[in-house]
Amino acid sequence: MAIPYRTRRTIRRALTVCLVVAVLLVTVCLCGMIWVQRYIVYAADGSVRIDFDLPPLTMGNTARPPQRLDITINIEETNQNPDFTGELTQLGGFYIEPETLTDIPAVLEQLKELPAGTPIMVDVKSIRGDFYYSSSVSSRRSNTVNTEDMDNLIAYLKDSGLYVIARVPAFRDYAHGLENVSDGVYHSSGGYLHMDAQGCYWLNPAREGNISYLTKIITELRTLGFHEVMLTDFSFPESNNILVNGDRQEILTKAANILLTACGNDSFAVSFEMTENFTAPEGRSRIYRSGLTATEAEQAFQNSTLPNPAVNLVFLTELFDTRFDAFSVLRPLMGAY
């Protein structure tokens, strides 16, 4: 049935009136909510209440912008050519991971971010007897490290203002042991050289030829601009099946003193990566320890008989435990970024 026109018109007017009333009610509610917000109190316990007894807000003076303070900050410029002579100081720096030497240009980019005076350690020779740089001591070169790139790296380090440390395997050298059999460490059964689990021959620390060989390497590194050399594998092989004529620790202590006397001076240190049982030579030298936890490092520091463990005892670690920061410590360069 069709709705008459008059009825439809009446309904339309009624709906229009209802819509207008609804809009007015919504507007009044919104205005009321805005007005009542000034009386809303948020309690510390998270509850909310309305308090109409709050005093009305008063208009104050226009807030002034904060006064600008002219503060002079004195920034001491970093000395690009720091003096590394005199007493040794505590180290806090980095070592270049050997595997990253396959991309020396990338290593150089990282080094350029370091401030002058930062200690940096780099490997210059492998346990196979390969030299990473253009050495005059030996013609053996690495197949994995580009010699020209390594020469450029060493040249950069020399003029960088960084404190540069060369890491060198001392008595673990496959090629030199093979070429100088009489100076090697022999198996206890006699007649042949001892070979370790990694297939390397070891050099006898008691042999003058080996001390002379190391002296030449260290002296060359000193002339290339290094401030310190750190000798790893400064020991006999960890085996009871080798021939040793004499006390092992006495032989190593004597070798360390000879090398320090021959190569060390007031601007160049000869250091050793050793265990806690090694007696360090007196002079410009440090003892390096690696593979320790922070707790073990704290114990090693407390038990150290070195004259100044904060300076003469250095930890090599991949850990970023802040307890290491109280000591001399070197961490991976890759971890600096």
Region roles according to the model:
Residues 76-77, 128-169, 239-267:
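Aromatic-lined substrate-binding rim segments of carbohydrate-active enzymes
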Residues 105-131, 220-230, 284-287:
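Catalytic domains of carbohydrate-active enzymes, especially glycoside hydrolases
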Residues 1-14:
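N-terminal Lys/Arg-rich, disordered targeting/topogenic segments
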Residues 84, 88-99, 171-219:
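Active-site-adjacent "subsite" loops/lids of carbohydrate-active enzymes
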